[in-house]
């Protein structure tokens, strides 16, 4: 009976979409009718009038396209959930690299997902395969402005995460991580939602404890070139626990270590994307410093599973999500060269300021309390990512993505080994 009720609801929604589409078409017709009358009265200024009409009609065309997709597009398979089990979920930064993969998982699990993104680093095409689906909504919105929506869970991922992007606009990065987090906590308080903050291993800075566990307070330069991101996330964590203690908001905090996979920006300045792109294009692989710095890399699907497990757990203290398998940057460069079968040479450049020398997560807490640990082998994840980057380069060469994503500019500093 419940399934029949759900099917009737879906049919009613589709009927509403048809009515909305017809109303939009009628509106466009009236606009063009007005335009025709104006042209008959006014002989000059045609281009200006036409421009104004295009500005008015453009968003309507986009809406009609979305409505058409809802009838014609084939979506990935979605699990059926009852009203009791289906959650209304908000993902800030949901059109970005990690956010779009999280969107895929939650949609396929049968939940209702609203993605909020200002498209500074997110891309609509990362989630366009869901546009028009009954359970999906995409909102162009900046989290530094308040948002009013009824949800059960909030995954707060919105923030530039690569050095070129957060160094390009450090004030914006700080605002997103402070004011944006404050707005999401306020929303969680108003509607009684649980909030998961996507924090970062950067809160540990250049660590003096190795591997890093959740009790380590960190070693961060508060005025260095990366401080806008590192300290922004530290403040965001502080605000989460202040709201938990004072307002009773349910919070979860994930400290995310280096992650890679499809939908990464090719020019985002992180070591994985840098090395793969350079190897594919036959350019020198640029290593900053000696290459003895270490990192631990996890594939994006492992991270997404960890985020969902943490959200649905009863763990309110911070949890590291990363791969404890440690590699030097030089070893990593040589591995990518081998996987790509590239003849590129390795070029050593001066070390970047405040570049952490060692980074490796202690994930005993995640293993014990969440039953989570990475399962995708490094080479398997890298091969998938290399294939994705190869397709991206081919598409760009054929002008299949218009406009192409713009590379973020850096005011100061150089890319580091994120």
Curated annotation (Swiss-Prot):
Q: Which cofactor does it need?
A: NAD(+)
Topology class, membrane:
Single-pass type II membrane protein
**Where does the record say this protein resides?**
Golgi apparatus, Golgi stack membrane
Report residue spans for region: Disordered: 397-418
UniProt-listed Enzyme Commission number(s): 4.1.1.35
Q: Does the keyword Protein transport apply?
A: no
Q: Name one GO cellular component term.
A: cytoplasm
Q: Which residues bind UDP-alpha-D-glucuronate?
A: 147-148, 175, 183, 186, 189-190, 243, 246-247
Q: Which SUPFAM superfamilies match?
A: NAD(P)-binding Rossmann-fold domains (SSF51735)
Lumenal-side segments? 39-418
This protein's major location comes to Golgi
Instruction: Give the UniProt keywords, A-Z.
Output: Decarboxylase, Developmental protein, Glycoprotein, Golgi apparatus, Lyase, Membrane, NAD, Signal-anchor, Transmembrane, Transmembrane helix
Query: What GO biological process terms does the UniProt entry carry, in alphabetical order?
Result: cartilage development; chondroitin sulfate proteoglycan biosynthetic process; D-xylose metabolic process; extracellular matrix organization; heparan sulfate proteoglycan biosynthetic process; ossification; proteoglycan biosynthetic process; UDP-D-xylose biosynthetic process
Tell me which Pfam families the record gives.
GDP_Man_Dehyd (PF16363), UXS1_N (PF11803)
Cited function: Catalyzes the NAD-dependent decarboxylation of UDP-glucuronic acid to UDP-xylose. Necessary for the biosynthesis of the core tetrasaccharide in glycosaminoglycan biosynthesis. Essential during embryogenesis for craniofacial development.
> Can you tell me which family this protein belongs to?
Belongs to the NAD(P)-dependent epimerase/dehydratase family. UDP-glucuronic acid decarboxylase subfamily.
Put simply, this protein is called UDP-glucuronic acid decarboxylase 1
**Gene source species:** Danio rerio
